[in-house]
């Protein structure tokens, strides 16, 4: 009986060792739009930590806001034999060919936060981006229900920027139609870069003799650039301005009263969930979707998370409570 038990233990041990030796390490290629932006640095760190805790290996590259660089980096990841591509696209309109290459190699593709259009991607995870725009516009009209509004969109090649604008206009249109709000300018900010937003805002102030009451800025980086221009004219804190991403600089401006609000998208939840989905895809599993979104080619299984309005009154109950920022940093 003892010999039988010993043999059984040995066989079980050998079997487990053999399974462990052949357990698949999922290789993930993470292609990021632009790591110069604080937002994506946080996503990367959280995603990599979670994916590695699930036994995956992650290769990260940043395109620094260049679509050709991103396509080249994705091709490089395909050649490295990754199992899954997680792509935060700079331009979601131009990646259909590299996605096709990936699919031909049996690689799964997850679009992270931004949709990839006209491509055979496997899954999409993001936030309800029209809702983001609605939160931005509503926060401003609650404070400035009439006056001159300037619309500062994000990158013209970012699909999300268009969704934010759709949400913004859903709120603003009745005010515009009634004549309460006048849109005195509408421009998109290349690369979401604050230096581009600064120039746009300077020109807008000049064109309107500084008579701007609210700026619908689509994220904190562009809000920061716009606020620089407003400050130079003595208008900082006097013009209502929105944001998004809950960047530390944006939260500091809200606390100081120079920025009205930001939209907090719980990035920890987004990145952790995306890592879980990527590993599931790499293991041949089918992640759970809560909806589908059409990208021009197919209805893509998707998971959309809920964004949160952050203002001076709820900083502690949102970004501080979640550990996204520390109170000592403010």
UniProtKB/Swiss-Prot annotation:
Belongs to the bacterial solute-binding protein 2 family. Involved in the high-affinity D-xylose membrane transport system. Binds with high affinity to xylose. GO terms for biological process: D-ribose transmembrane transport; D-xylose metabolic process; D-xylose transmembrane transport. One of its GO terms (molecular function) is monosaccharide binding. The keyword Signal applies. Residues 1-23 form the signal peptide. It holds the Pfam family Peripla_BP_4. GO terms for cellular component: ATP-binding cassette (ABC) transporter complex, substrate-binding subunit-containing; membrane; outer membrane-bounded periplasmic space. E.coli has two D-xylose transport systems that accumulate sugar against a concentration gradient: the XylE system which utilizes the electrochemical gradient of protons and that is insensitive to cold osmotic shock and the XylF system that uses a high-energy phosphate compound and is sensitive to cold osmotic shock. This is D-xylose-binding periplasmic protein. Keywords: Periplasm, Signal, Sugar transport, Transport.
